[in-house]
Amino acid sequence: ILSNCEGAVELLETLTKKKDPTFLTWLPLSHSYEHTVQFIQIIVGAKVFYAESLEKLISNMGVAKPTIMTAVPRFYQNLFTKINMNFEKQKGLKKKLINQTLELGKKILKKEQLSFSEKILNFLCEKLVRKKIRSQFGGNLQAFVSGGGALDQNIGEFLNAVGLPTLQGYGLTEASPVVSCNLPNLIKVESVGPPFRTNKVKIAKDGEILIKGENVMLGYWNLEEETKNVIKDGWLYTGDIGELDQNNYLKITDRKKDILITPGGDNISPLKIENELVNSEMIDQAIVYGDNKPYLVA
């Protein structure tokens, strides 16, 4: 756990050196993600607020004025829906300005060069749109950190574009739990960022992500056989499929056990389809079924 905290503190240094850090916590304190975050809060000397409830989370942000907040993808999905619904109600010049904010924000996120006129327009977007959105969340937010599941790429792009920096990370309880996280100065929403310096990551021949480091568990309590299945030669076999890009950013593509195989031999990722379905405001949860079946259903 301390090794995990060390890696996280290095990430947070750029976010906490300008202001005294303030966290707003709402995940269960027994959750492995939140459990480790609590130690990190102590290490960086943060002021910690505990949310009253999920329903009051947004209003609590106005009081706490957090600089950093950790949450699971479900929260960001709800946030995306609420902001987007408000955007849809706008008309005329406001609507055009919102569209420009999204377009220019996504270009900046992808490190694309803005023209002189785009820079002027982006300055207006910053003052008239992004600043107002940030003020609704306390006005001091340096970053949202997403973990505990896959964050939809469209949602990540949207939140970053409207002025809410959102860093997606990756981890699992067996690794204490954080393995990697996006960096504030180079956010790749399609990835979960570079591995922490305190652990090693490599990709097996079949694409499985393997982890080694002091953050990896010793084993499952009184489950020797299960431990042998996941820890081999000091490497933790995560069961996740992924790849490392040229910047050493890790991208999760699937769960090894979740791949659906059709009678025709096609390998299909249900996660991608499920994520597309739940983007609809009419769908709360989705599951795709059809392993070894002639067609898929959801």
Task: For each feature predicted by the language model, list its residue ranges.
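Conserved ATP-binding/catalytic segment of the ANL
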Residues: 195-262
